Amino acid sequence: MDAFKQQLEQLSAKNQYRSIPDLVHQGRYITRENRKMLNMSSNDYLGLASNENLRQSFLQQYGGNFPSFTSSSSRLLTGNFPIYTDLEELVAQRFQRESALLFNSGYHANIGILPALTTTKSLILADKLVHASMIDGIRLSQCEFFRYRHNDYEHLKNLLEKNVGKFDRTFIVTESVFSMDGDVADLKQLVQLKKQFPNTYLYVDEAHAVGVYGQNGLGIAERANVIADIDLLVGTFGKALASMGAYVVCDQILKECLINQMRPLIFSTALPPFNVAWTHFIFERLPQLSKERTHLEQLSAFLRQEVEHRTQIMPSQTCIVPYILGENEATLAKAKDLQEQGYYCLPIRPPTVPKNTSRIRLSLTADMTADEVRQFAVHL
């Protein structure tokens, strides 16, 4: 046990020790240690998680005869229910693709897709700043991989030119909206690149984009009009859609490969049908949430400008606004100060972000008012 204790002490010395906070949620507010604060750290981008009207409308349609609260099994055994197929068909239809497949979480999706679809003769080329879950999936695949510099497509092209002919298939891996910087990948350019090389597939994670961007809330791929050109388009239900789980839209043959070879899918008890029914209910309504998307973009543009004025650093183009302070100690102190002012802001430190880029990740939601965000900016 001494070795474990020493590890924790080392984390504390570097201001990298983490703990799980005790929180009470009240809509867009959080209470911690008897202090009520505006939640500036949520991924509930459309503000749907505490929407009582939506919740009551969903419950009333069942009249007390609710879907099961558990699946009790993997979908490949006895854990499949009609609502799963209904949601997969709805997602595929909205994206105008052949098929969709559901997963228990974005993490399950990202650690399972690449190992299922690659061989030891495959190549993965991933953006330097892709999410930890994608990195874990790459490692589990046990195939050759390189990281291209963040959003540097000349570097990616060079890697493709040097390596594609040596491998049976190549996967380009990126997020659309990057979770820590809030900047956006150029999906049109990535599509053009992958079309130049044989047996090359594009895998895009839209976890922080689905619901928020695009005319119908289908993400950056919809906004860029490239949905049909992305081989594996992943999204999650646990952020803007106020639910749980994830999906991939893809060709039917890729779906069948995943069903047969993706371990997190095969060996996990499926999500509760009740949860999947709620996801279906929300996903149906995505196109009608344009007012929320517009309001969120207005709030985001204002806050990005305010933070850039103070730091001269603003990579973000989205509702994720990084307030980059650099050092761990300064970031922890500023987060504490903002919490004392009534704003639940959290420090993000290495290894989650690169060394010397510690930041407060400010995350806006559509249920915030313009006055609340303006008042917050005063305290920055």
Swiss-Prot record:
Pfam families named in the record: Aminotran_1_2 (PF00155)
Binding site residues for substrate: R18, H131, T352
Keywords, sorted A to Z: Biotin biosynthesis, Pyridoxal phosphate, Transferase
UniProt binding sites for pyridoxal 5'-phosphate: G106, Y107, S179, D205, E206, A207, H208, T236, F237, G238, K239
Cofactor dependency: pyridoxal 5'-phosphate
GO molecular function: 8-amino-7-oxononanoate synthase activity; pyridoxal phosphate binding
GO biological process: biotin biosynthetic process
Transmembrane segments: none
E.C. number(s) listed in UniProt: 2.3.1.47
Catalysed reaction equations from the record: 6-carboxyhexanoyl-[ACP] + L-alanine + H(+) = (8S)-8-amino-7-oxononanoate + holo-[ACP] + CO2
Keyword Transferase among UniProt keywords: yes
Post-translational modification N6-(pyridoxal phosphate)lysine, affected residues: K239
UniProt xrefs under InterPro entries: Aminotrans_II_pyridoxalP_BS, Aminotransferase_I/II_large, AON_synthase_class-II, AONS_Archaea/Proteobacteria, PyrdxlP-dep_Trfase, PyrdxlP-dep_Trfase_major, PyrdxlP-dep_Trfase_small
Pathway info: Cofactor biosynthesis; biotin biosynthesis
Quaternary structure, from the entry: Homodimer.
Functional note: Catalyzes the decarboxylative condensation of pimeloyl-[acyl-carrier protein] and L-alanine to produce 8-amino-7-oxononanoate (AON), [acyl-carrier protein], and carbon dioxide.
Entries under NCBIfam families matching the protein: bioF
Family: Belongs to the class-II pyridoxal-phosphate-dependent aminotransferase family. BioF subfamily.
Protein name stated in the entry: Putative 8-amino-7-oxononanoate synthase
Gene: bioF
